[in-house]
Amino acid sequence: MLKFTLHKKDGYARRGTLELNHGKIETPVFMPVGTYGSVKAMNPQNLHDIKAQIILGNTYHLWLRPGLEVIGQFGGLHGFIGWDKPILTDSGGFQVFSLSDMRKLTEEGCTFKSPINGDKLFLSPEISMKIQTVLNSDIAMQLDECTPGEATREQARKSLQMSLRWAERSKKAFEDLKNPNALFGIVQGAMYEDLREESLRGLEQFDFPGLAVGGLSVGEPKPEMYRMLRAVGPILPEHKPHYLMGVGTPEDLVYGVAHGIDMFDCVMPTRNARNGWLFTRFGDLKIKNAKHKLDKRPIDESCTCYACQNFSRAYLHHLHRAGEILGAQLNTIHNLHFYQVIMAEMRDAIEQGKFADWQAQFHENRARGTD
């Protein structure tokens, strides 16, 4: 089940509601990444506290470990991980294609060696749909070939055509399995605007209830990614949700929303938190730096997260230097809370028709820097 309601537009920025089998999502939305069925350093209560509406799970990793037999015993991923809100799963394609020296790609699918035990495994559109049906994610993704950013035009065209054929197979398998959730198609085409349009036109025939933009933030320069967003975001179908996969920084989220994107996921806020890199309204802060050793202030005095309301930079500096798990948890709570606040503020600004003003103030604040 998927129902998308577009409430308001302000330029290309969109304010909507996405209804799924496990609840409603207000968009634009950021989805914390729970690769192995957990968002690193967070428990489900932490996620509820920061007002996360939906999380992402990784099909490839969950298939390898703990496996479908285990997760199937719990009726899917929600029951297994104790999360009652929506979940999106990727198709597993990105991880398989990352194993460039351990995999073989054909029209049928991809053969690869398990990085866990060396077993020979095979992933196809049909198998990806079967895995995601067992996971019972609210949003599943088609299996696509992940085109590298540096692909030549001919490589990108061949790749997107393969992805279109796999989109058709994914949709058929999804329907044959009587999966009650939603399946998204993925727009590919590397850094070529005309190929992105060709991919989008090709996907129209399958009438997916939502569309994702894939193949960005894969090593290309930031101006190139933004050029593709300017080209693709505004031409995505208005009545469907738009998902930008694997992106990104706070500035990337704002740029994406400004060009018609509704949904985002990225490991950056969680990974950076574990490395002591904290996002704030006034720029980024590296908590490991010695200047924080005696600092009694919170990370961000305007922030209402648990970490900022209860702990000093000095304590967080100590925890990080000591390698304490609590440090990673508090840093992660802060970064994910900050991302959720950005999204909530953008939703409000779009509703009020003041997105451009909000965007200008956001960039001014971020450029100011922390002291």
UniProtKB/Swiss-Prot annotation:
Active site residues of this protein: D90, D265
Alphabetically ordered keywords of this record: Glycosyltransferase, Metal-binding, Queuosine biosynthesis, Transferase, tRNA processing, Zinc
Region (RNA binding), start-end ranges: 246-252, 270-274
Protein name: Queuine tRNA-ribosyltransferase
Quaternary structure and partners: Homodimer. Within each dimer, one monomer is responsible for RNA recognition and catalysis, while the other monomer binds to the replacement base PreQ1.
Known EC number: 2.4.2.29
Annotated residues for binding of substrate: D90, S91, G92, G93, F94, D144, Q188, G215
Gene Ontology CC annotations of this record: cytosol
NCBIfam families: Q_tRNA_tgt (TIGR00430), tgt_general (TIGR00449)
Function: Catalyzes the base-exchange of a guanine (G) residue with the queuine precursor 7-aminomethyl-7-deazaguanine (PreQ1) at position 34 (anticodon wobble position) in tRNAs with GU(N) anticodons (tRNA-Asp, -Asn, -His and -Tyr). Catalysis occurs through a double-displacement mechanism. The nucleophile active site attacks the C1' of nucleotide 34 to detach the guanine base from the RNA, forming a covalent enzyme-RNA intermediate. The proton acceptor active site deprotonates the incoming PreQ1, allowing a nucleophilic attack on the C1' of the ribose to form the product.
Cofactor: binding comment: Binds 1 zinc ion per subunit.
Catalytic reactions on record: 7-aminomethyl-7-carbaguanine + guanosine(34) in tRNA = 7-aminomethyl-7-carbaguanosine(34) in tRNA + guanine
Family matches, as InterPro entries: ArchSynthase1/Queuine_TRR, TGT, TGT-like_sf, tRNA_ribo_trans-like
Binding site for Zn(2+): C303, C305, C308, H334
Transmembrane intervals: none
